[in-house]
């Protein structure tokens, strides 16, 4: 779809959506996004120019259907997939991608660390995906030196970043905010550093006693991103991995640096979103969102959960969806899903489904609470279908139509029950929605009440 759009921009030194937006140009991607969001194209352009919205759209991902991430638009959901050395491979990851898109993922991150040729896996995912694809390039950089952190060089990392940009990756998690002087701040944490990318860079800094190479070479990364329109997803390497560590000095120190890096990228018209925690008690979620907006000048906030309790192993998609709904309400622009397997293992296809649906619920609830245009239309349509006992319409309107139909049909599978004025919960005699309050009956009641003596 985008081949012709992109062809007209080739040869320019800076092809980012932010660059065009700041020149007053409404690109085809902005116009497409405006129609998807039911928002004016000029609003999309101004939000992208301001840095409050991004359109992750690598010029080499031509089969992409453009979307946006920002507070002016619907709250988005990301699904993580990716092969590991001990589980999964290309076929399984393509199946997860298909499921993620089916159940509403707005973007997908390929976090593969093994399971085959990483370039082959990533290229296949990009070619098969109509949604933006994100990566964490430090993973492949480490794999390129066979897991030996000490041998990793800045040149190795930059080479991988450029290669992934050429392949069509739309946004990359760059953990440039974890500085060597921040490492002692984790001393009193219960769970230390829980970011994989952060852990890799921390080990590198401890081994070499040198500053984070992603920080010292940040301008080099900017130059790569300008050429392909790759968006920064500034990684929170020092995010809290448990409630005890939430909102601590290490997290806040890194956040301040992420704000500085955001402004540096903006100086070159490169798009940025900022990643956030993690594990946060409910009473600290609003503070975390407000603090990010303050430090990062309202760059879109992309949060992992956050989980609101640490004891829900096997059910962390529920624990985190609670936090995600609150974060979305307070202003987070995208929610990274958590599956039931979080902290326990690599998610399978069913875990992807359960995690995504939990997060689609959270994002939709946030959209309703923020009064986004048309956010509640589907809910009202569902309510009408329920009141009219239109079971097939209820299934269609559900976030997971197959699951809704499956649960209904467990006890009432025959077609005749698709028009029945009851379900198996109340049965035919006790459903309160059978009590229809028609206008004539209510008018008659009002006339009767009007005749009654007042107390």
Curated annotation (Swiss-Prot):
<feature type="binding site">
    <location>
        <position position="426"/>
    </location>
    <ligand>
        <name>[4Fe-4S] cluster</name>
    </ligand>
</feature>
<feature type="binding site">
    <location>
        <begin position="195"/>
        <end position="197"/>
    </location>
    <ligand>
        <name>substrate</name>
    </ligand>
</feature>
<dbReference type="InterPro" id="IPR037509">
    <property type="entry name" value="ThiC"/>
</dbReference>
<feature type="binding site">
    <location>
        <position position="423"/>
    </location>
    <ligand>
        <name>[4Fe-4S] cluster</name>
    </ligand>
</feature>
<feature type="binding site">
    <location>
        <position position="275"/>
    </location>
    <ligand>
        <name>substrate</name>
    </ligand>
</feature>
<feature type="binding site">
    <location>
        <position position="343"/>
    </location>
    <ligand>
        <name>Zn(2+)</name>
    </ligand>
</feature>
<keyword id="KW-0408">Iron</keyword>
<comment type="function">
    <text>Catalyzes the synthesis of the hydroxymethylpyrimidine phosphate (HMP-P) moiety of thiamine from aminoimidazole ribotide (AIR) in a radical S-adenosyl-L-methionine (SAM)-dependent reaction.</text>
</comment>
<dbReference type="InterPro" id="IPR002817">
    <property type="entry name" value="ThiC/BzaA/B"/>
</dbReference>
<dbReference type="GO" id="GO:0009229">
    <property type="term" value="P:thiamine diphosphate biosynthetic process"/>
</dbReference>
<keyword id="KW-0949">S-adenosyl-L-methionine</keyword>
<dbReference type="GO" id="GO:0008270">
    <property type="term" value="F:zinc ion binding"/>
</dbReference>
<feature type="binding site">
    <location>
        <position position="279"/>
    </location>
    <ligand>
        <name>Zn(2+)</name>
    </ligand>
</feature>
<dbReference type="Pfam" id="PF01964">
    <property type="entry name" value="ThiC_Rad_SAM"/>
</dbReference>
<dbReference type="GO" id="GO:0016830">
    <property type="term" value="F:carbon-carbon lyase activity"/>
</dbReference>
<keyword id="KW-0784">Thiamine biosynthesis</keyword>
<keyword id="KW-0456">Lyase</keyword>
<feature type="binding site">
    <location>
        <begin position="236"/>
        <end position="239"/>
    </location>
    <ligand>
        <name>substrate</name>
    </ligand>
</feature>
<dbReference type="GO" id="GO:0009228">
    <property type="term" value="P:thiamine biosynthetic process"/>
</dbReference>
<dbReference type="GO" id="GO:0005829">
    <property type="term" value="C:cytosol"/>
</dbReference>
<keyword id="KW-0479">Metal-binding</keyword>
<protein>
    <recommendedName>
        <fullName>Phosphomethylpyrimidine synthase</fullName>
        <ecNumber>4.1.99.17</ecNumber>
    </recommendedName>
</protein>
<keyword id="KW-0411">Iron-sulfur</keyword>
<keyword id="KW-0004">4Fe-4S</keyword>
<keyword id="KW-0862">Zinc</keyword>
<comment type="similarity">
    <text>Belongs to the ThiC family.</text>
</comment>
<feature type="binding site">
    <location>
        <position position="302"/>
    </location>
    <ligand>
        <name>substrate</name>
    </ligand>
</feature>
<feature type="binding site">
    <location>
        <position position="431"/>
    </location>
    <ligand>
        <name>[4Fe-4S] cluster</name>
    </ligand>
</feature>
<feature type="binding site">
    <location>
        <position position="139"/>
    </location>
    <ligand>
        <name>substrate</name>
    </ligand>
</feature>
<feature type="binding site">
    <location>
        <position position="80"/>
    </location>
    <ligand>
        <name>substrate</name>
    </ligand>
</feature>
<dbReference type="InterPro" id="IPR038521">
    <property type="entry name" value="ThiC/Bza_core_dom"/>
</dbReference>
<dbReference type="GO" id="GO:0051539">
    <property type="term" value="F:4 iron, 4 sulfur cluster binding"/>
</dbReference>
<comment type="pathway">
    <text>Cofactor biosynthesis; thiamine diphosphate biosynthesis.</text>
</comment>
<feature type="binding site">
    <location>
        <position position="175"/>
    </location>
    <ligand>
        <name>substrate</name>
    </ligand>
</feature>
<feature type="binding site">
    <location>
        <position position="109"/>
    </location>
    <ligand>
        <name>substrate</name>
    </ligand>
</feature>
